[in-house]
Amino acid sequence: MDRINTSAAPPTSPDWERLRADFPLLQRHVHGKPLIYFDNANTAQKPQAVITATDTFYRRHNANISRAVHTLGTEATEAYEATRAALATLLNVPMHELVLCSGTTFAINLIAYSWALPRLRTGDVILVSRMEHHANIVPWQLIAERTGARIQVADILPNGTLDLDALHTLMTPQVKLLAITHVSNVLGTVNPIHDICRQARQRGITTVVDGSQAAPHRHINIPAIGCDFYAITGHKLYGPTGTGALWARREHLHIMPPFLGGGEMIKEVSFDGTLFNTPPHKFEAGTPNIAGFIGLSAAVDYVRRIGIDQIETRETELLAHLTEELQKIDGMRLFGTAPNKAAVVSFMIEGTHAHDLATLLDLEGVAVRSGQHCAHPLLQYYGVTATCRASLAFYNTHEEIERFITALLKVRKLLG
C-alpha cells in the first residue's frame, strides 16, 4: 500500500536554525521587514512535514474513514487511526481512551454536556480558577444555569500563581468538579497540576485539565497527573486547525452518553432505538477533519523527533532573555512572574494602549497579540482592559528578541 508519510522530520540533535527553516511561513516579510512571529500561544506555525502530509492525503488518498473497504478508504482509516496512536503515545494513555475532536473548546463542552449535565444538582459546586480561558469558564456557567449548581473561583496571587491554600480550602464536599488550566495562556504560569489533582482526588472531586498551552511545550504524562479529563488542541501543537483530543478515564467514557448523534458513533439503528458504538467512537459522530488529523500526526512525529524536553529547555532560555530585556524598559509592567513559567509574557507600557502597541509593532514586522486573550476575569483582577502578549516557540531566536526590543523601543517613542 502507498502509505501516507507523516514522519519527514528533523535530526535528533536540535539545530535550531535548521529547524526554523522547516517552517515556510517564517521566511516571509511583513511591511517590508522580516516577520517576527511572537503569537505562538494563539496558534503555532506549521512545519513543511505537516503541510506535505495534508497535501499528500488530498492528492493520493482522499476518502472517508471507517465507511469503505476499498483501498483509498482503508488507507485513510489507517492514517487517521495512526494519529490517535501518535497522540496516545505522546500523552502516555491507551488509544481507546482518546477521543479525537476539533479542539479543547469542543472537548470541554463534551465533558460539560455528557458528564456534568446528567450528574450535577442544586447545591453542587463547580470550582474554576481565576486564570481560566473562557473555554473553561463559559461551558460551566451554562451547565450551572441548567442544573442549579454554583461556580466558585479559586483566586491567584499578584505574581500570577494560584493561591494554593485558598484552592485547597475551597475543595469542600459540595465541590463535584474542578476545571483548571495546566498552563495559563495569559501569564504562562505552569500550575502544580499533579498536586492539585491529587488533592482533588482525595476529596472525590472530578478534575478537568485544559492542556492547550502545555502539550506543545512540556512533557505530558497523564497517568502521573492523575486527572479525570485532559484536553489538548492540535493547532497549538504545530498541527492544523480544527484538530484536538480529549482523554478521559475509561469508567467515565463508558457511562457518558453521546454528545452528538450521526454516523460512526452507532452500531445499529432502527426506529425502535439505537445501539451506540463503544468509546471513543461513540463520541465521534460524522466525518471528521481527516486531512487535519493526518497533518497532526505529522506534527506529533516532528515534535517527538526534536524531543519535548529539548523544546522546553530551548523555550526557557528564550523566555529568560525576553523577560530580562523587557524589564529594562522604563514604564514596563509585566503580568505574571511565577517562578515556573512557559514562554508567555503579557505586558503593558505606561501611557500606551495594548492595541496601539500591537498595531505599530506589526508595522515593524512583529506579530504579538493584544486584547483580553479570552480571559476577561483574569485581566479584571489586574485592573486592565487589555495587554500585549509575546509568546515564543522553539523556532524563535535570540536575534528576534533583540529586534523585537528595538522595535518596541521605537514604538514606545512614537507613542510618547
UniProtKB/Swiss-Prot annotation:
Catalytic site: C374
Taxonomic lineage of the native organism: Bacteria, Pseudomonadati, Pseudomonadota, Gammaproteobacteria, Lysobacterales
Cofactor(s) the protein needs: pyridoxal 5'-phosphate
SUPFAM superfamilies on file: PLP-dependent transferases (SSF53383)
Pfam families: Aminotran_5 (PF00266)
Name of the gene: csd
Modified residues annotated as N6-(pyridoxal phosphate)lysine in this record: K236
Natural source organism: Xylella fastidiosa (strain Temecula1 / ATCC 700964)
Entry keyword annotation includes Protein biosynthesis: no
GO biological process, one term: cysteine metabolic process
EC number(s) given by UniProt: 2.8.1.7
Entry similarity comment: Belongs to the class-V pyridoxal-phosphate-dependent aminotransferase family. Csd subfamily.
Molecular function terms, GO-annotated: cysteine desulfurase activity; pyridoxal phosphate binding
Function description: Catalyzes the removal of elemental sulfur and selenium atoms from L-cysteine, L-cystine, L-selenocysteine, and L-selenocystine to produce L-alanine.
Catalytic activity: (sulfur carrier)-H + L-cysteine = (sulfur carrier)-SH + L-alanine
InterPro entries (UniProt xref): Aminotrans_V_dom, Aminotrans_V_PyrdxlP_BS, Cys_dSase_SufS, Cysteine_dSase, PyrdxlP-dep_Trfase, PyrdxlP-dep_Trfase_major, PyrdxlP-dep_Trfase_small
Top-level EC class as recorded in UniProt: transferase
Keywords: Pyridoxal phosphate, Transferase
Name listed for the protein in its UniProt record: Probable cysteine desulfurase
